[in-house]
Design a protein with these regions (language model features):
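Short beta-strand "wing" residues that participate in macromolecule-binding interfaces
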Residues: 58
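Short, surface-exposed linear patches
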Residues: 31, 38-40, 66, 78-81, ...
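Basic, amphipathic "hinge/linker" alpha-helix immediately C-terminal to the N-terminal HTH DNA-binding motif
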Residues: 63-85
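Glycine-centered, phosphate/nucleic-acid-interacting loop/turn motifs that mediate DNA/RNA or nucleotide
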Residues: 54
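Residues within the DNA-recognition helix of helix-turn-helix
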Residues: 46
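N-terminal helix-turn-helix DNA-binding core of bacterial DNA-binding proteins
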Residues: 2-42, 61, 68-72
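Amphipathic alpha-helical dimerization/coiled-coil segments
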Residues: 1-2, 79-103
């Protein structure tokens, strides 16, 4: 009845990151950290999980002798996000049907 949700995106922080990246061309680590209220360590771990899944690309470079990490969503990430949204909508549709039957 219920389809399994993408375990990579079914994490609050990873879903927040993908939601941010889908609306921008690219985002710096500090911007993502600020918008998600994540700690640097936790965010770094979650970004690596998204990267390993092929959902984002991470670019590390130096700007004025300071490290600069930026991220952008991949086509795979966009497709995964769109499917995740569809799957959640399907969940809600099933729940609505079940609730309607109970009335």
């Amino acid at each position: 009845m219920f389809k399994e949700l993408d375990p990579i995106l079914h994490s609050q922080l990873r879903l927040a990151v993908i939601s941010l990246l889908i609306s921008v061309k690219e985002a710096e680590f500090t911007f993502i950290k600020e918008k998600t209220n994540a700690t640097a360590g936790n965010l770094s771990v979650q970004l690596n999980k998204l990267k390993e899944a092929g959902y984002i690309e991470i670019n590390k470079q130096f700007k004025d002798n300071y490290p600069l990490t930026s991220c952008k969503i991949t086509t795979t990430g966009i497709n995964a996000f769109e499917q995740y949204v569809k799957d959640l909508q399907a969940y809600l549709h099933i729940v609505q049907k079940l609730l309607y039957r109970m009335l």
